Structure formats: structure tokens, C-alpha cells
UniProtKB/Swiss-Prot annotation:
Biological processes, Gene Ontology terms: D-serine catabolic process; isoleucine biosynthetic process
InterPro entries linked to this entry: D_Ser_am_lyase, Ser/Thr_Dehydratase, Ser/Thr_deHydtase_PyrdxlP-BS, TrpB-like_PALP, TrpB-like_PALP_sf
Reactions mediated catalytically: D-serine = pyruvate + NH4(+)
Name of the protein in question: Probable D-serine dehydratase
GO molecular function: D-serine ammonia-lyase activity; hydro-lyase activity; pyridoxal phosphate binding
Modified residues annotated as N6-(pyridoxal phosphate)lysine in this record: K114
UniProt keyword annotations, A-Z: Lyase, Pyridoxal phosphate
Signal peptide location: none
Enzyme Commission number(s) from the entry: 4.3.1.18
Pfam families: PALP
């Protein structure tokens, strides 16, 4: 499909004008069909969950703040009723059902959703090396990975990654604490405080004046020249993806504890901010495994960086970038500032994702301020992208397509997945708050 031809498409023209759009995915095919395209299944997610469990004693020792959750990195699921009322008042639209916030923004160690996938892939690599060199067995107490002799062993190896910020933060901190030499290749969008935090752990931060795609490509290139360097590929990694996917079974457990039902009469809607796609894609995969067709997964992207929407809508996936259409990929949502989506995630998940919408930067600041005022919860701009999702779901086309009745909608649970912000310095947070209009 030629770019010139695409530019005649009225929907693409809206994207090119940076208009906010909502698109319900006609390729969404239900779980039975959709999962067959992924190339992974529930046993892969289960193995990831078991690996994280093996590392629990390590976390308790290396990161004492995780002791209260017995070394398991998991985020709170909280009700945001005051925010729900404020959204209804400000937008003059109803939100039926329960509105909850999944606070990956406050996950331990790196304060973002990337603490799921990024940390998991570092652990998988560390375990592989330690097992191959007979430093541990799978039945051992993994807290011994804190021992100096094992850290010295890991120091012979290095890890590289390209990032807009949060993935680099999770991989950099985890890798450095284990003893690895870590290089994080950071795009122009990356926040200065994230670079400083990484440097405080002894991580080598390589800065670029170009966007995320260049940082990843350069990181990959640098890693190729060193046989002892492991490159974590945010665009194509199934390991990262599986680390995120464990969230599905964890959420199911939280629902059991909170008495929340998910079934035909109690649908679940989850709104996930999307950058390159690994985090939301992996979480959505885990959610579909856990809840089947009763969960609806909606991706939210900035109007200036709608890369996954563009890839899935056109079917071109990583063969097209937003810049090809003159869309600049410049957004306040630094974690979502990605011009070309993951080809792996797009192709794997295009039959499981139910919808996409875009949101302008100013709304992110407005919603950030509103959440702060109503619930006293502070997030970074990217993390607010999912907050207007419940307003979109009232669209009659969506309800008609999925045969959702008003009664079912009244029983629905809406989850806004807060992807980051728990570690943002106060000075930076005050700047964000000053930009909100509400």
C-alpha cells in the first residue's frame, strides 16, 4: 500500500491533522481465534509467573521494600469514585459501572509498568547465566544471588537497551543491582531525572537527539560488537511480553479478593496507554488468557504518536511509521513517543485488541491535575492516556457491535492502567500540575 494512496483515506487524514479519534477494531476475532496468532500460550505465562516466584527471596533481600509483598512485585488496584464523578461533570457524559485505577505507576524498584517486563527479562537472563555456570539450581534459595561472588560473576557480562525512559530505568536499576554492566540508549524524549537516577546506579546512559527508533537501533548495533552483551529488544522480545502477561492472573486474584465479578453480565474494560506496544500488548495478552472474551482491551495513544493504531489499521505494522505521514512524534507523553510500533506485538495482538483511541497532550495534563485534586494520586502524563476510555465506550457503535446491553454496562468494571509516575521528583510533578486547566 503506497503512502500517497493511504493519505487519501479520510481516517488517516484525521490522524494527519492530529485529531482525536476512536477506532473499533474490525479484526478483533474473539479469544479462541485471536490467541492462535500470538505464538505463545498460557503455559508460557505460567512459566514466567513461576520464575518471578523463584526470585521472590532475592527481592526480599536486595530490595527490602518488597518484603511486605513477600518479594512479589505487584501494584494496587484502587477505586477512584471521586475522579469518576469529576469526569462525568467535566465531560457531561455518563460512566456506567465501577472505575478503578491499576497503579503500576507505583510498582516497586522503578515505578512503572516496565517493572513487569523489563525487570523480568533481566531476571530471565541472570537465571540462565547462573544455571549454565552451576552457580544455582532452580530449587535453591535465590537470595544468594545477592552474594558478592555471584555479583562479580555477573559483572563480566553487560546488558544494553534502547528506551524513552521507563524501560531503561527498570532494566538499568535491576541489571546494576545484580552486578551487570548496563548501557541504556535514551531517545531525545527521555526526562533528565530518569537519566540522573540511572547514573546514580552506575549505569552508562547514552543520549541521542533523535527519537526512540534511533536509540533502539544504536543500542542493538553497539551490543552486536560485544559477545558478552545481551541486548533487550523492546520491539521484538517475547520475554518482555511474557513478563507483562503475568499481570492477567495477578489481576484475577485481586478481583477475587475484592469480590469483583467478570462474566457475560459483568464485562471488564481495560484502557492501556501504548507506546511501542510491548507493555500494553503483553498485559492485554495476559488479560485475554485470564478473562477470555469478557475483557475488552482498548489502547490509548497520543495524537502525535499513534503508531500502533496506524500499524493495525493499515495492516502494515512496523513497515510504516507515523513520520511517513508527516506526523511528528513529539508529545508530552514521553513514554508513548514512538513512531513505529512493534511488528511482533501488532501482528500477534491485532485479532485480540478491541479498540484504539488518541488523546491530545493538553488533556493528559488536565486529567493529571484532576486526579491529583480528586484522589491525591500523582502520575506522569503518559499514564493518564487511559483515563477517558470509559467515556468512549458509551459510543453506541461499540456497544452494538459487542451486543452489550445497558444492564451489562451498569455492571461493568473499568480499569485505567496507570503506567508510570510514582518516582517523578516533586519539582517535575509541580511543573506537570501547573499545566492542567481544571
Amino acid at each position: 500500500m503506497k503512502i500517497q494512496h493511504l493519505m487519501q483515506d479520510p481516517f488517516i487524514q484525521k490522524l494527519m491533522r492530529f485529531e482525536e479519534v476512536m477506532w473499533f477494531n474490525p479484526k478483533s476475532a474473539g479469544v479462541k481465534t485471536g490467541l492462535s496468532y500470538v505464538g505463545l500460550d498460557v503455559s508460557d505465562t505460567q512459566q514466567a509467573a513461576e520464575r518471578l516466584q523463584r526470585f521472590a527471596p532475592y527481592f526480599c533481600r536486595a530490595f527490602p521494600e518488597t518484603q511486605k509483598t513477600k518479594g512479589i512485585l505487584e501494584s494496587e488496584l484502587v477505586s477512584i469514585d471521586k475522579m469518576k464523578s469529576a469526569l462525568i461533570d467535566h465531560y457531561h457524559m455518563p460512566i456506567q459501572g465501577r472505575l478503578l485505577l491499576k497503579k503500576d505507576s507505583h510498582l516497586p524498584i522503578s515505578g512503572s509498568i516496565k517493572a513487569r517486563g523489563g525487570i523480568y527479562e533481566v531476571l530471565a537472563y541472570a537465571e540462565k547465566l547462573a544455571l549454565e555456570h552451576h552457580l544455582i539450581t532452580e530449587s535453591d534459595d535465590y537470595s544468594q544471588l545477592c552474594d558478592e561472588k555471584i555479583k562479580d560473576f555477573f559483572s563480566r557480562y553487560s546488558i544494553a537497551v534502547g528506551s524513552t525512559g521507563n524501560l531503561g530505568l527498570s532494566i538499568g536499576i535491576m541489571g546494576a543491582v545484580l552486578g551487570f554492566k548496563v548501557s541504556v540508549h535514551m531517545s531525545a524524549d527521555a526526562r533528565e531525572w530518569k537519566k540522573q537516577k540511572l547514573r546514580s546506579y552506575g549505569v552508562n546512559v547514552v543520549e541521542y537527539t533523535q527519537d526512540y527508533g534511533v536509540a533502539v537501533a544504536q543500542g542493538r548495533k553497539a551490543a552486536l560488537s560485544d559477545p558478552n552483551c545481551f541486548f533487550i529488544d523492546d520491539e521484538n522480545s517475547t520475554t518482555l511480553f511474557l513478563g507483562y502477561s503475568v499481570a492477567g492472573q495477578r489481576l484475577k486474584q485481586q478481583f477475587l479478593e475484592q469480590g469483583i465479578k467478570v462474566d457475560e453480565n459483568h464485562p471488564l474494560f481495560v484502557y492501556l496507554p501504548c507506546g511501542v506496544g510491548g507493555g500494553p500488548g503483553g498485559v492485554a495478552f495476559g488479560l485475554k488468557l485470564a478473562f477470555g472474551d469478557y475483557v475488552h482491551c482498548i489502547f490509548a495513544e497520543p495524537t502525535h504518536s499513534p503508531c500502533m493504531l496506524l500499524g493495525v489499521y493499515t495492516g502494515l505494522h512496523d513497515k510504516i511509521a507515523v513520520q511517513d505521514l508527516g506526523i511528528d512524534n513529539i508529545t508530552a507523553a514521553d513514554g508513548l513517543a514512538v513512531g513505529r510500533a512493534s511488528g511482533f506485538v501488532g501482528r500477534a495482538m491485532e485479532h485480540l485488541l478491541d479498540g484504539f483511541y488518541t488523546i491530545e497532550d493538553q488533556k493528559l495534563y488536565d486529567l493529571l491535575g484532576l486526579l491529583h485534586k480528586t484522589e491525591n494520586i500523582q502520575l506522569e502524563p503518559s499514564a493518564l492516556a487511559g483515563m477517558i476510555g470509559p467515556l468512549h465506550i458509551n459510543h453506541s457503535d461499540y456497544l452494538r457491535r459487542y451486543h452489550i446491553t445497558q444492564e451489562q454496562l451498569a455492571n461493568a468494571t473499568h480499569i485505567v492502567w496507570a503506567t508510570g509516575g510514582g518516582m517523578v521528583p516533586d519539582v517535575e510533578m509541580q511543573k506537570y500540575l501547573s499545566l492542567g486547566r481544571f
